[in-house]
Amino acid sequence: MIEFVKGTIDYVSPQYIVIENGGIGYQVFTPNPFIYKVSNQETIFTYHHIKEDAFSLYGFSTREEKALFTKLLNVTGIGPKGALAILGSGDPGAVIEAIEQEDEAFLVKFPGVGKKTARQIILDLKGKLADVVPEMIDNLFNHEARIEKQEAETALDEALEALRVLGYAEKEIKKVLPHLKEETALSTDQYVKKALQKLLK
């Protein structure tokens, strides 16, 4: 079993990246391929999914992301594509928090996750994620930190909706989202300005 692939990013598409190592290009499906840049050296933590008619590699920037992905695969009704879409939010901590707080409304935002699947995720995983990212679990009940985080997420959500109103496609928005998530405590207007700076380059 290959734990990770370390090499040069050769190609980036909306669904996957190609990372070259030793003259071999590995096609790796990732939650958000646009966080990677062509020619950069990267370490991708991999998960092998084998079916009768396919062999696929799924890759993650951290071991914690990979661990959460494998946990999600244990949930009835969640396959690799569904788990990848959930992690595409770019914030594993928010996913874990939603599970621990039984926040079905958050989980149903993801493609392919209805109320029944959201409930199944909570039933199967609540209380079983401390080994994925322990410090996230420790901080879940810090009320002040949670309020600040929720306010920041609201501002970011409003900014993303504003970009859609301005006519930007989901592909373009997804490309700048990782840069926006690096910022903290910004207002909706500030997030929009940051996004436009990236989009208009």
Curated annotation (Swiss-Prot):
Keywords: Cytoplasm, DNA damage, DNA recombination, DNA repair, DNA-binding. It is found in: Cytoplasm. The keyword DNA-binding applies. Residues 141-150 are annotated as: Flexible linker. GO terms for cellular component: cytoplasm; Holliday junction helicase complex; Holliday junction resolvase complex. GO terms for molecular function: ATP binding; four-way junction DNA binding; four-way junction helicase activity. One of its GO terms (biological process) is DNA recombination. Residues 1-61 are annotated as: Domain I. Homotetramer. Forms an RuvA(8)-RuvB(12)-Holliday junction (HJ) complex. HJ DNA is sandwiched between 2 RuvA tetramers; dsDNA enters through RuvA and exits via RuvB. An RuvB hexamer assembles on each DNA strand where it exits the tetramer. Each RuvB hexamer is contacted by two RuvA subunits (via domain III) on 2 adjacent RuvB subunits; this complex drives branch migration. In the full resolvosome a probable DNA-RuvA(4)-RuvB(12)-RuvC(2) complex forms which resolves the HJ. The RuvA-RuvB-RuvC complex processes Holliday junction (HJ) DNA during genetic recombination and DNA repair, while the RuvA-RuvB complex plays an important role in the rescue of blocked DNA replication forks via replication fork reversal (RFR). RuvA specifically binds to HJ cruciform DNA, conferring on it an open structure. The RuvB hexamer acts as an ATP-dependent pump, pulling dsDNA into and through the RuvAB complex. HJ branch migration allows RuvC to scan DNA until it finds its consensus sequence, where it cleaves and resolves the cruciform DNA. Belongs to the RuvA family. Has three domains with a flexible linker between the domains II and III and assumes an 'L' shape. Domain III is highly mobile and contacts RuvB. This is Holliday junction branch migration complex subunit RuvA. It comes from Bacillus velezensis (strain DSM 23117 / BGSC 10A6 / LMG 26770 / FZB42). The gene is ruvA.
